[in-house]
Amino acid sequence: MSQVILDLQLACEDHSGLPEESQFQTWLNAVIPQFQEESEVTIRLVDEAESHDLNLTYRGKDKPTNVLSFPFEAPPGMEMPLLGDLIICRQVVEQEAKEQDKPLEAHWAHMVVHGSLHLLGYDHIEDDEAEEMEALETEIMLALGYEDPYISEKD
């Protein structure tokens, strides 16, 4: 199994308590090589202001969000291993984990898994797409040793 090349960017002001780069690498490697041989992904950890600006600009949502996925589209005739960028907002991830009573590490892992599946073309707009994507997320999270991230929503 091939390994994903990770470019980790720490753009948030406070770096304390963030997952280690090796954890991000593990989470990416649990998802992407199943679908794509050679890949490079940028994960950018940001504060609420940058997340808010990007979410407003690209999704029309006037608030910060947990993870944004920007798939890379190579010009025609050019093959590159760049899969895309994940922008993850530290404060939103931490707040959601607290509100949902989930272990913080597990929620970070889920955001990387969720965002990676978006980079690979998965979506959750339609119900059937959401079911497929959530099933994959659950399978990957369980394989990583975490609980089903949707368990409280299914009860």
Curated annotation (Swiss-Prot):
Comment on bound cofactor: Binds 1 zinc ion.
Name of this chain's protein: Endoribonuclease YbeY
GO molecular function: metalloendopeptidase activity; RNA endonuclease activity; zinc ion binding
EC number: 3.1.-.-
Organism for this UniProt entry: Citrobacter koseri (strain ATCC BAA-895 / CDC 4225-83 / SGSC4696)
PANTHER family per UniProt: ENDORIBONUCLEASE YBEY, CHLOROPLASTIC
Top EC category: hydrolase
Record's GO cellular component terms: cytoplasm
Role this protein plays: Single strand-specific metallo-endoribonuclease involved in late-stage 70S ribosome quality control and in maturation of the 3' terminus of the 16S rRNA.
Cofactor names: Zn(2+)
SUPFAM superfamilies reported in the protein's UniProt record: Metalloproteases ('zincins'), catalytic domain
Cellular localisation: Cytoplasm
Coiled coil: none
InterPro entries from the UniProt entry: MetalPrtase_cat_dom_sf_prd (IPR023091), YbeY (IPR002036), YbeY_CS (IPR020549)
